[in-house]
């Protein structure tokens, strides 16, 4: 199973995102639904709302992304996946203890990686460098294998 963090999901949802093309290329090889946890929903939808407020995206892009989420859920591209909170936070605390001193992992990185473990994912897709380092340090396979080159945003 493949878990996609918010940087990857947002790249899929926003055609103008620097990472949209590589995200679409990776996702085209998926053979099962993308797990969509409550944390992923909150992070993706809040980021879209913030991007609209900060005029990073237009109202049309914002609304299209929300419609796409609903369509992807209805079509089974995204699948609601619950990560029980007690297990999520138990794993997150352990990841923090083991990896933050070396990687300087942020809480969101830790929670997304813990989510991948709780739902049984063996792969994590991300365009966030710190998230990628943490996932790799925990033994998860990380996609895309390398980061696209260019002037993408520092995530």
Enumerate the predicted regions with their spans:
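Active-site-proximal, substrate-binding regions of enzyme catalytic domains
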Residues: 39, 45-98, 137
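Short, well-structured N-terminal submotif of metal-dependent ribonuclease cores
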Residues: 1-42, 47, 51-64, 129, ...
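A short, N-terminal amphipathic alpha-helix
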Residues: 26-30, 74, 118
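Acidic, PIN/NYN-like endoribonuclease modules and their adjacent C-terminal/linker elements
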Residues: 1, 71, 98, 113-155
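Active-site neighborhoods of divalent-metal-dependent phosphate/nucleic-acid chemistry enzymes
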Residues: 51, 77-133
